[in-house]
Amino acid sequence: GKTAEEAWKRDRDRGYISGEYIWTGFDYIGEPTPYYGSYPAKSSYFGAIDTAGFPKDIYYFYQSQWSSKPMVHLLPHWNFENDDSIKVDGDKILVYAYTNANSVDLYYNEDVNSKELGELVGTDTYEVTNAGYNKSYKETKEGKLHLEFKVQYKPGKLTAVAKDKNGKEIARDEVKTAKEAKKLNLTADRQVVKANGSDLSYITVDVVDENGTIVPNADNLINFEVSGNGKIVGVDNGNAASVERYKDNKRKADHGKALVIVQSDSNAGSFTLTATSEGLSTDNIKVYSVNEEDTDKMEIVGYDVNDITVPVNGKLELQDKVTALYSNGSKGEVAVTWEEVPSDKLSKAGTFKVTGTTKESNIPVEVTVTVKDIIGILDSRVLTGINDKVELPKEVSAIFNDGSIENHLVTWDRELTDEDVKSVKTVEIEGTVEGVSGLKAKVIVTVSDKFKMKNIAVNEGQEFPKAFTSYEGADNINNINDGVISKNNSPQNRW
């Protein structure tokens, strides 16, 4: 029943206690304390690391107490535009800094992309406390093992500058307000694995905004596909209340993150994981698999190169150096010479590859370039009743050739009239999309005198909707949406 800080202080200050174990380091399936019997809780909540292997904030508390390497970790995230639930003293948010430094200066800058610290919000400092047995510890005068600030919420960037006892900066951390989710970003713990049919690469998927900042409230459904010498053996997001399958090719993000575990086969080569999500730009990552006898060698097997997206008629900037991946798992920067790219390649939407060479290997470097442009405007649809003159939407959705979707303001050629909604009919109105040329928006208004509420998930004897399951148990899965609710054995369909 103790918090992490309370438990550690109690053990720390007793000279006869040599250390502390925590229960648990990792979350695990089962024992969802205190939510026993509360669907959909399925795993523990008290681990310092979740089931996907992502560190929670409390992980950094232990790091601040047990690590000698300078560190500071800020929490919470900084996306609270429409959330007053954690505010204190009216409109302020309690910001923690876990650190093993002596003090922390907290700065605020409204520009998330600025390299400047901005204005000083405040400073909090530890006092050095003698534990009474030849050991000293840092804690605040109130006895806290973290530093804290009360900060008025405004979108922007908070930066923590941690300093030692001499006032010298030794660590830094920051949290930024994320904008709308725009793309997926994949990173692998290892991009070179053994081709033995059992080695694993753990690939993290981040949902990020246009600046590359993780969107902390993103829960997009992400689909995965593997090509080449590997297969997906597990997916997760660390959410203790998620009942999604671990063996699947899709997963919803939790707080902007998900995990895919890919297993190599027994053939040396490579595999590519591609992640897609509706409305977001796609990403992929290539992992190389090598024979076990080659894992001690220092040979280039491939390169870690990020795909590039540029607007139509934009400037293509290729890197002078790329990251080489070696058979022993190490990485290194090597210079690359790229082929010439004709200017007309950038004049229209599409995708093409650019090839480069390095002096260190005969293996070519390849980067995929997407020339991004709007390829269509989704029709807007409005349903209304007779004599009900509704307001037309103020925005429409533009679809790009990279799969992303953006909303744009629209000016309709006209508004709905009384005549439009006088009788049952369908009315189509076009509009001009702000910032888009050559494409018109369209809203389709259906005027009806018949409205009927219907549960479209219920099967009423037709072929669809059809229920299915990945595991066939004793119960008939088709009973789940036959419209019959059974709380006992009459009728005996258990749904």
List where the protein language model places each region.
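Short aromatic-acidic-glycine turn motif
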Residues: 114-129, 181-186, 225-242, 293-295
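Extracellular Ig-like/FN3 beta-sandwich strand-entry sites
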Residues: 153-157, 200, 268-270, 349-353, ...
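Short, hydrophobic beta-strand segments
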Residues: 147-153, 247-266
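Compositionally biased, intrinsically disordered or flexible polar/acidic segments
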Residues: 450-495
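Beta-strand-rich structural segments
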Residues: 95-99, 161-162, 198-216, 222, ...
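Extended substrate-binding grooves/exosites of carbohydrate-active enzymes
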Residues: 1-143, 148-153, 157-169
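Serine/threonine-rich, repeat-prone extracellular segments and beta-strand-based repeat modules
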Residues: 329-367, 403-447
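Short S/T/G/P-enriched beta-strand
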Residues: 64-94, 100-101, 170-202, 206-215, ...
